[in-house]
């Protein structure tokens, strides 16, 4: 799957991923009204609004982008209907030939990680039949439990030709409480980065490993160090736009070939119509605002890489 991601990034010229992280406050009133009219002000109604919101954004942007990243918590909050909306979103994005990064941040003891990996990246056998539960192409993984929590995911990736993005240095302000702690004079995130490179060497695609890393845009100097530690790992870069990251801050996350990183923007794209720069589109044309935000993001990052 890493080969497909790289191929689509080259084809679109867009090293970006749209984070499908819907909150009800992002969804235009006309979509909410229609969903509530059909299902009431219920979990089912909220999930229907989320699904229709996602569908419009995907319809307006899929030809510009290589991938989407639905954050599962935004669906879990609506219970079973929300999870059904998550699955519908994944399936619809697949129908548009998008790469799907399941932002699930899983990680547990071996048997539990194996179940998580099966659910999100693999297949499950039920009697004589086999099913694909969610069917994402990549999953985000928390490595805090160590190798026996990560290896089950790697095993499924090898079997299914899927991929991982392992949390290394996250974009949130308090990430340094643990990730920056020194061990033998070196920050923990560097040691995790070395482990990602080691895991990644086991399963290489044509140019890059199936095993990538999450490194926040808000820490560009750390990203520069980690790029050198993990030269064959794709880096998923959250924190662009709404969290403060800009194209010029991101150049060190990329290799000299202009590849090696994919930058995420969530509310900066899906709620673009709420921003002053895109207010002219209005709530009725929120999908067009999202498309314009994608085009601006591509131009920003491409311009920064060209000037590197």
Q: Which residues does each predicted region cover?
A:
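C-terminal helical cap(s) of enzyme catalytic domains, especially alpha/beta-barrels
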Residues: 250-256, 271-308
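Conserved, mostly hydrophobic/aromatic
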Residues: 18, 68, 103, 139, ...
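A C-terminal functional module that forms or caps the active site or interfaces directly
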Residues: 217-264, 268-275
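Acidic (Asp/Glu)-rich catalytic clusters
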Residues: 58-64, 92-95, 154-159, 227-230, ...
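N-terminal glycine-rich anion-binding loop in soluble enzyme alpha/beta folds
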Residues: 1-60, 279-281
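Glycine-enriched alpha-helix->loop->beta-strand junction motifs that scaffold or abut catalytic
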Residues: 65, 134-137, 158-164, 207, ...
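Glycine-rich, proline-tolerant flexible connector loops at the mouths of alpha/beta enzymes
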Residues: 45-46, 69-82
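Conserved anion-binding
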Residues: 108-211
């Amino acid at each position: 799957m890493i080969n497909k991601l790289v191929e689509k990034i080259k084809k679109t010229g867009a090293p970006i991923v749209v984070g499908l992280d819907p909150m009800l406050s992002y969804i235009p009133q006309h979509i909410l009204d229609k969903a509530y009219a059909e299902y009431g002000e219920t979990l089912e109604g909220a999930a229907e609004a989320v699904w229709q919101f996602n569908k419009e954004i995907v319809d307006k942007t899929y030809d510009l982008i290589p991938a989407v990243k639905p954050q599962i918590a935004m669906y879990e909050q609506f219970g079973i209907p929300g999870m059904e909306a998550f699955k519908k979103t994944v399936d619809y994005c697949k129908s548009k030939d998008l790469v799907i990064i399941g932002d699930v941040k899983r990680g547990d003891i071996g048997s539990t990680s194996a179940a998580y990996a099966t659910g999100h990246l693999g297949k499950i056998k039920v009697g004589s039949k086999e099913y694909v539960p969610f069917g994402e192409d990549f999953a985000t993984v928390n490595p805090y439990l160590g190798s026996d929590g990560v290896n089950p995911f790697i095993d499924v990736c090898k079997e299914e030709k899927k991929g991982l993005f392992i949390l290394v240095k996250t974009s949130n302000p308090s990430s340094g409480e643990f990730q920056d702690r020194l061990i033998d004079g070196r920050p923990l995130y560097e040691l995790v980065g070395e482990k990602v490179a080691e895991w990644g060497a086991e399963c290489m695609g044509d140019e890059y490993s199936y095993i990538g890393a999450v490194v926040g845009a808000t820490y560009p100097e750390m990203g520069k160090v980690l790029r050198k530690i993990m030269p064959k790992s794709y880096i998923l870069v959250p924190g662009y736009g709404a969290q403060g990251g800009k194209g010029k801050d991101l150049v060190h996350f990329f290799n000299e070939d202009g590849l090696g990183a994919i930058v995420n923007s969530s509310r900066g794209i899906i709620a673009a119509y709420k921003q002053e720069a895109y207010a002219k589109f209005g709530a009725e044309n929120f999908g067009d605002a999202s498309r314009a935000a994608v085009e601006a993001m591509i131009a920003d990052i491409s311009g920064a890489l060209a000037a590197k």
